[in-house]
Amino acid sequence: MVVLNPDTNHPVSNPCGWIPPISPDSTPIPEDVSASSRAGHGIGVLGMIWAEDKAQVLGAGGKMLWHVPADFKHFKDTTMGSPIIMGRASFLSLGQALPGRRNIVLTGSREFTAPDVEIAHSLEEALELCARTPQVWITGGAKVYREVMELGLADLLVVTQLDMTAMVPPMSTVAYAPVIDPVRWQLDLTRSDENWRPKSGDAAWRVRYYIPR
């Protein structure tokens, strides 16, 4: 399968674990003070954005398992102009920094460098780089999503659901979307798609928005 960079529409050589996401036209803070602000970072809205199949699979074997161009465009439109925070593997899957956004890469390596990106060695450091920013997006991978969820830092979840079950290669390590706890999160019915959007590439798709209870 050929995987395309969502901005350039060109093939990428190492599509490991990047998940194409989604978007709102505007992202109001659901509380007087956002979760990330309470943590001391002063970020207006800290959103997490991803795409998943019917089994909540994000990818497997270091690869994306689908090609849905309309969702790629939705991700680009949503994140344009805002910082994006991602793990090193997710960045490498893109093949390059995404233009029009601050690209912040999480890595434990002190030697890792890449053009047009900022390096952070912890989630805390990445959030500090974005202090007093109106909107920040977490764009992968599974480990980063899980850490943000466990710390209770996110203000908004934007989830693309794909009307498909991905074919996972045998013996592959599968990356799954984080669990959305219904005690903490509620579906925003005013913005979420009720019906599937038309098929694009491999699947029909819809966008679901979750806000804190």
Which residues make up each language-model segment?
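Enzymes that bind and transform nitrogen-containing heteroaromatic metabolites
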Residues: 2-10, 14-213
